Structures are given as C-alpha cells and as structure tokens.
Amino acid sequence: DFDPVIDNALDAGNPIPEALQSRAELRQKVRNCADFKPLPAEIRSLFPSEFEETELGWVPKGWSFTALKNFGKIICGKTPTKSNKNYYGKDFLFIKIPDMHGKVFVTNSHDKLSKLGSESQSNKIIPHGSICVSCIATVGLVSINAQDCHTNQQINSIVPNSPHYRNYLYFSMLEKYKIFHDLASGGSATLNMNTSVFSNIATLMPNNLVLKQFHKITEPWFEAILLNEYKLTSLASLRDTLLPKLISGELSLEDLPDLNTDTEAA
C-alpha cells in the first residue's frame, strides 16, 4: 500500500510517476472527502515523499525488490523414513498441508516426530515463528509455526533474519497466491514450485523503520489469534477424548458436573 507515500508526495508537491497517476487521483478523491482521517504524523514520517523506478516498477524511494531468500533462510521440509517407527512420536510437530488449512498459526499436527526423528534431520528443523508456504499440489497456503517443528517436502519455510520481518512476510506471501500458482504451473498435472524458484521470488523490501512499526502495530492481532488457536486446539482435544466415551456409554452427561452447571447457567 503506497498511500502514505502518495500522501507525502502530494503534500510536498513532488511529481507522481505516470504509472501511479490513477492511484494518486483516487487517493486525492479520498483526501477530499469530509470524513477523511489522515494517518498520524509519526506514521507518515516513516514513509518517503518520492518514488523511484526499479526493473520491476516504481517503488517508494529507499525501498527495493529483493529475492525472498534475502529475508531469511529457506528450508524445504523432509519426511523421515517410515521404516523406522522410532522416528515418530510426540515430541515435534510434523506439519503437512492438511495441518495448514485455515490456520494463521499451526499449533498441532496429525503426525509428530520423536526427538530421535528430529535429530535424524537436524538441518530441517523449522524454528518457531517461521513462515510455512505450501509449494506442491495445493500451492499457496501460508501459516506460521507456533513452535519448533518439521514439515514434509511439500512445504518451504522462511526463517526470518529478524523477528520484525515475520508479520510483513506473512501478508506478503498471502498476496503472492497467484504468483505462486503461475510459477508452479510447469505443464504437469501436479503444481510444483521448487525451492530454488521459491527462494528467488522478487519481494518488496520496505525500509527497516516501516517493518518495525508494522510489526509493532500488528503483533497484538497475531498474539490474539495465536491464543485463540491454542484454545481451539485444547477444545478439539477435549472433544476427541469425551465424544467417543459419551457415544459408547462409558460416560454420561451426569458424569460431567461442570458441563451441567454451565448448561443450566446458560
């Protein structure tokens, strides 16, 4: 969103590139509305008042396009051999595409690795707070791992060089859904975006002050989402424990006094 830069350029009387003229005109109409509320001065001061041209188009002065790998280490997941059952257990999440659907944060996974399984591919461990992107078959799902984990080979993960890159990268990857699909369409029936292609995707790099402020503003939202996700995981676990016992008759509602109390109160 270049609106703060356009605002600054308009106020400073700086020229707007022809390619951005239509956006500037729309922005000016918004600014002329009676109920227009400008961004706080301290936020606008983080943005430049000029644009500069790059090979990939116009960007705010001081910003640039760079390969995704320059934001952090890219790790392609791997599946430990199934022939060694000791590699699987309950110590580490082993994230696969079904675990990512509808999740901003992944807090649980259907399969898990043991400590031994993790150690068998220690170079594939994904530190918590990384951005996981599905790149084979179902392409373009984006999630954040809530704890150190592993993924299978259908997922590439970005380990941010700095914690304040995380939230920006999450939204940036969501916006690249169509780009991911275009890059993964190689003529075969199955979509496949390999790690090399993924690592070199051009990604807009704002200045560091903007990235830090963006993280500061958005982090409370992410913290609330993560807390809710843990609550949902806990409730799902409780459901999966109690429901079979209720269906089989091993338990009845009378055996759950807290539930009865809550129901009566409602």
Language-model-detected regions and their locations in the chain:
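Non-catalytic DNA-recognition/assembly elements of restriction-modification systems
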Residues: 41-78, 210-213, 219-255
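Intrinsic disorder at enzyme termini
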Residues: 1-54, 252-265
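A generic secondary-structure signal for well-formed alpha-helical elements
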Residues: 1-4, 9, 13, 75-79, ...
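Low-complexity, Lys/Gly-biased intrinsically disordered segments
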Residues: 20, 29, 36-39, 44, ...
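Basic, amphipathic alpha-helical recognition segments used for DNA target recognition
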Residues: 67-75, 101-111, 122-128, 141-225
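A generic structural signal for residues embedded in beta-strands
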Residues: 133-134
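Short, structured beta-strand/loop micro-motifs enriched in basic residues and often containing a Trp
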Residues: 49-50, 108-117
